């Protein structure tokens, strides 16, 4: 524990908590603080200019990161007939209907994303108490309830991330791994921010992207100077 505490203290000493760093310097600092033995994820937190308590200002959606997430995901799909075959061809790990629902009810949740064709929601809807708390419930707002299940599978496998604002008005997302080149991380961050701007509620007033910070799994958050993102 002492070693961990010393490492955390050393990392904090590298960063001025109130300073906003150019994106290149911010990523360099984050990577230098990512000293765990595994390939830490690089995460971003975006403070939005919205009132998360208002239902018409809940920001939610998904985006396919151009450089991927660095993580392989298992995808389950509720579909039948031609759509089921298309999902399998696209790379789905598990495809089914009532049989898949029974697996879920039995606690067999060996997947990271659940996709459903609209005509299967009569089955999927009964699984809300199981899938919902785990963040697995399909939703059209993030593209996981769709007639084109094959494309949804491809998106998931290609590095799609889902985002939803929390009660504090902050979006949390992973944009890659420590092993990623900075250009890949910046490309992913840009794609995420573009998606957030597109998802801006019509009732949101004032500055929308208020603060952006990047960090690693075990590291300290580093604030990003937004003007450097367009450089």
From Swiss-Prot:
CDD domains: Ribosomal_L1 (cd00403). It comes from the Bacteria. InterPro entries: Ribosom_uL1_bac-type, Ribosomal_uL1, Ribosomal_uL1-like, Ribosomal_uL1/biogenesis, Ribosomal_uL1_3-a/b-sand, Ribosomal_uL1_CS. Gene3D superfamilies: 3.30.190.20, 3.40.50.790. GO terms for cellular component: cytosolic large ribosomal subunit. GO terms for molecular function: rRNA binding; structural constituent of ribosome; tRNA binding. Pfam families: Ribosomal_L1. Keywords: Repressor, Ribonucleoprotein, Ribosomal protein, RNA-binding, rRNA-binding, Translation regulation, tRNA-binding. GO terms for biological process: regulation of translation; translation. Part of the 50S ribosomal subunit. Belongs to the universal ribosomal protein uL1 family. Binds directly to 23S rRNA. The L1 stalk is quite mobile in the ribosome, and is involved in E site tRNA release. This is Large ribosomal subunit protein uL1.
